[in-house]
């Protein structure tokens, strides 16, 4: 998968090359990542990329010409079918389903805005989709681009150490992930749940599903409201709720 980023600060992405899932995907050649700085496309000697907004108001707005020229070069280099994504609070909110939809593209070009944003006409003329990573404001779109690139890299075959890791992540099946444990078996009185030591794979699968359902019920009930649970899931969730309420019932 090919990625490109239009950014004033390409150095922010250096950490992606050196570590984690994205670094592994880059080294394996599963993804490519290129950058275009709008300042390199400015026509004046000061390499100006912003100007005061029409109508007044605080801050500066990124102008069309340097961004548009950078997008044209990026599109050409990333190849046919490249989609241009502008990262902004007004965009579609990112979730796992959104990542899976974006993963169907061969190449994506992210436009990372700064200041008060970009001239609206650039969005109308050049942008295919707007995306947001949440209802809050960042200093620019670079961190949002990194979030999306990381999420997409995880979905590519062969990138994660274990093939099933991505399928067990939170949100993949519309639920939060179950708890995980490793050595030691006991620490300061806190024990690993016995079922995980039993070797009974059917019981382990059932426990993990129950915990995922219960954790979602406790922490993100909105996710459950969007799902239709099958009979097993209904029984496991009811069992979790009974156990939880019994454990947390206040003494009379």
UniProtKB/Swiss-Prot annotation:
Task: Name the SUPFAM superfamilies for this protein.
Answer: alpha/beta knot
Q: What is its EC number?
A: 2.1.1.228
Question: Which is one Pfam family of this protein?
Answer: tRNA_m1G_MT
Q: Chief location of this protein? A: cytoplasm
Catalytically driven reaction(s): guanosine(37) in tRNA + S-adenosyl-L-methionine = N(1)-methylguanosine(37) in tRNA + S-adenosyl-L-homocysteine + H(+)
UniProt keywords, alphabetically: Cytoplasm, Methyltransferase, S-adenosyl-L-methionine, Transferase, tRNA processing
Q: What is one GO cellular-component annotation here?
A: cytosol
Ligand binding (S-adenosyl-L-methionine): 113, 133-138
Instruction: Please give one Gene Ontology molecular function term for this protein.
Output: tRNA (guanine(37)-N1)-methyltransferase activity
Q: Which InterPro entries match?
A: Alpha/beta_knot_MTases (IPR029028), tRNA_m1G_MeTrfase_C_sf (IPR023148), tRNA_m1G_MeTrfase_TrmD (IPR002649), tRNA_m1G_MTases_N (IPR029026), tRNA_MeTrfase_TRMD/TRM10 (IPR016009)
Q: Domain of life here?
A: Bacteria
Keyword Cell membrane annotated: no
Q: Which GO terms describe its biological process?
A: tRNA N1-guanine methylation
The cellular location(s) given in this protein's UniProt record come to: Cytoplasm
Query: Which family does the entry's similarity section mention?
Result: Belongs to the RNA methyltransferase TrmD family.
Summarize subunit and interaction data from the UniProt record for this chain. Answer: Homodimer.
Function, as annotated, reads: Specifically methylates guanosine-37 in various tRNAs.
**Sorted alphabetically, which HAMAP family does this protein's record hold?**
TrmD (MF_00605)
The protein's name is: tRNA (guanine-N(1)-)-methyltransferase
Write down the species. Nitrosococcus oceani (strain ATCC 19707 / BCRC 17464 / JCM 30415 / NCIMB 11848 / C-107)
